[in-house]
Amino acid sequence: MKNNGSLDICYNVQSAVDAQNHFIIDISTTNDINDQNQLYVMAKDATELLNTEECTVVADTGYYNGTEIKKCIDDGMTVLIKKAKANNSTKDNEFWKEKFTYDPERDIYICPTGQRLDFFENTSKNGMKYKKYKCSSCADCKYRNSCTSLKSGRTIQRWEHESVLDAVYEETQNNNNIYKQRRCIVEHLFGTVKRTLGYSFFLRRKIENVDAEAASMFIAYNFKRLLSMFSTQELAEKFS
């Protein structure tokens, strides 16, 4: 998996944690190099285990994947996630895609200098459909070299379901106080397991064995949480 820009040979452990009591609801061990295909399956499993129809999924940028986010939204979940940084062709951040405004009524983009980019073709990549927009005013623009290196002028791609991502972005911005709690909820458990419990690497091999080993450790974590919330006598009464 990816680790600080390099690739490490290791397993990738996913976890879903409830925000109220910080119990681990579900875990999954994968050998994927990143988290981008894990958002929906983890959120779906957690929702089913909690037997709830309402679920707010708070995830870090590593999980940002348009298809995964849309699956969550289609299932009635609320998703709070920061946008991943786009691969922009220009180093000048004043002309990154995020600085361009989309007008849904006219189906055009407006660039930071007020020029318009009109739709000119449909395209697809990795099974995802996009619309492409191009500016016809680049030739005489004094900011051209800061905006694009293409001889034909600046272009922008828009995914067919990008409006879903726009809505998720607005939802995340409006609930930034909730999003900020993510580290305390999820990162806390990994810090506890690694530092307090001293569990920093797996002893088993093969993914099914590692998954069982991780599950055992997280059961111990959940039990530790229980003991911090209830006395031994209270637990005995609850489970008797």
Question: Predicted segment positions?
Answer:
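Anion-binding and metal-coordination hotspots
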Residues: 1-240
